[in-house]
Amino acid sequence: MYYPFVRKALFKLDAERAHELTLQQLKRLSGTPLTKLIHQSLPFKPVNCMGLTFKNPLGLAAGLDKNGECIDAFGAMGFGFIEIGTVTPRPQPGNDKPRMFRVVEAEGIINRMGFNNLGVDNLVENVKKAHFDGILGINIGKNKDTPVEQGKEDYLVCMDKIYPYAGYITINISSPNTPGLRSLQYGEALDDLLAAIKTRQSELQARHHKYVPIAVKIAPDLSEEELIQVADSLVRHHIDGVIATNTTLDRELIKGLKYADEAGGLSGRPVQLRSTEIIRRLSAELQGRVPIIGVGGIDSLISAREKIAAGASLVQIYSGFIYKGPPLIKEIVTNL
């Protein structure tokens, strides 16, 4: 496979520049006959989850294609589902650069992007042009300058706009890079947000005559007590799925490595065991009442199997995909 050569060239560039360049090239391919260049024919391995049928259990995690510009290109690679975003109501530039760093020795990535995106209206236009026949998830967040107390309004604005086009919607309350966002994972703030989202979901279901499931994406840095509270809230509010987990603020496993002291969320192999443990504990707590989508450090068939064994119904990749490329998709889908 050509990917090791592509990776070698990309890894000579700054991490964000390489990311931009890759998306530019994939955007050129999307929706053209040239997608054949990256097409992988993979077996059909359907999984029913959240009331939807996924053509295979492997998805692309949110954050790679924030604006939904390369949906068809990623679809051609064989993903069973693709999650685009995080998108916010209004466009925003994100945090100052540099804001993405490869921790190569640990096969990790640190980012403090800060929900840089072109806004929900732009994303909707891109989704309308896509031809992907798998499940499309859309991950939504709040604008940086929206006070946390008013944060739920941002989620509702995004829901209104994406509902007709989404296979499922993910509520991102776990990015460490938007001030105050993670506070929405706790207690009354979480209950208030989830109640508003479920009410809006019912209204939109009546308006559009279709039910779009809601998933909540959580952090790996939750204590045992916090995790129990989150699980309780998810069940009480009849949330359709939970995505575990986002990036970690913990640096224990990369201490002393280059970029280890950079601020932001750490993803990739260093978060693998922690996210699997969260899935295991969450699964024990939820008892099958809310399905789990496992994400965090999956970089092989073995680590994908570990997430499933811990209680995940579906899995997603991001950092592992950066390090291993399309062959990782084939390895996991063919053998899982």
From Swiss-Prot:
Pfam families: DHO_dh. It is a peripheral membrane protein. The active site is at S175. InterPro entries: Aldolase_TIM, DHO_dehydrogenase, Dihydroorotate_DH_1_2, Dihydroorotate_DH_2, Dihydroorotate_DH_cat, Dihydroorotate_DH_CS. Pathway: Pyrimidine metabolism; UMP biosynthesis via de novo pathway; orotate from (S)-dihydroorotate (quinone route): step 1/1. FMN binds at A62, G63, L64, D65, K66, T86, N139, N172, K217, T245, G268, G297, Y318, S319. It catalyses: (S)-dihydroorotate + a quinone = orotate + a quinol. It is found in: Cell membrane. Its cofactor is FMN. One of its GO terms (cellular component) is cytoplasm. Substrate binds at K66, N111, R112, M113, G114, F115, N172, N177, N246, T247. Keywords: Cell membrane, Flavoprotein, FMN, Membrane, Oxidoreductase, Pyrimidine biosynthesis. One of its GO terms (molecular function) is dihydroorotate dehydrogenase (quinone) activity. Binds 1 FMN per subunit. One of its GO terms (biological process) is 'de novo' UMP biosynthetic process. Its EC number is 1.3.5.2. Catalyzes the conversion of dihydroorotate to orotate with quinone as electron acceptor. Belongs to the dihydroorotate dehydrogenase family. Type 2 subfamily. PANTHER family: DIHYDROOROTATE DEHYDROGENASE (QUINONE), MITOCHONDRIAL, DIHYDROOROTATE DEHYDROGENASE (QUINONE), MITOCHONDRIAL-RELATED. Monomer. This is Dihydroorotate dehydrogenase (quinone). It comes from Erwinia tasmaniensis (strain DSM 17950 / CFBP 7177 / CIP 109463 / NCPPB 4357 / Et1/99). The gene is pyrD.
